[in-house]
Amino acid sequence: LSADQISTVQASFDKVKGDPVGILYAVFKADPSIMAKFTQFAGKDLESIKGTAPFETHANRIVGFFSKIIGELPNIEADVNTFVASHKPRGVTHDQLNNFRAGFVSYMKAHTDFAGAEAAWGATLDTFFGMIFSKM
């Protein structure tokens, strides 16, 4: 990743990282099978849990970790290893990760000037998920 790509991604993410509930909602809406992987949410209606404290806590955890990754670009090997160590044992699939990506990108398109950052995000997400897929 180039310095310009990293700067673009970081600036773009800074605009949305304060809405972790919205980000997680978009991801779960895009692929309910992702939500089903979390025992506290499995079998529940997304609309009814969106405003709850457990949902907000989990959203903060996920977006906080993603914020850490974005902040540490391009040095994300340790974060990838942490992610793989916690997600591989739970049987998270490549399809679910691709759907997570699609839900996240959809959220970004709706809440930022994504067109100007799309190439940088594409390169960043390709790098991140490529590293994960090589280990899962």
Swiss-Prot record:
Residues bound to heme b: 87
Gene Ontology molecular function terms on file: heme binding; metal ion binding; oxygen binding; oxygen carrier activity
Gene Ontology cellular component terms for the protein in this record: extracellular region; hemoglobin complex
UniProt domain Globin: residue ranges: 1-136
Alphabetic keyword roster: Heme, Iron, Metal-binding, Oxygen transport, Transport
Superkingdom of the organism of origin: Eukaryota
Note: There are at least 12 different components in Midge globin.
Family from the record: Belongs to the globin family.
Quaternary state and interactors: Monomer.
Designated name of the protein: Globin CTP-III
Organism per entry: Chironomus thummi piger
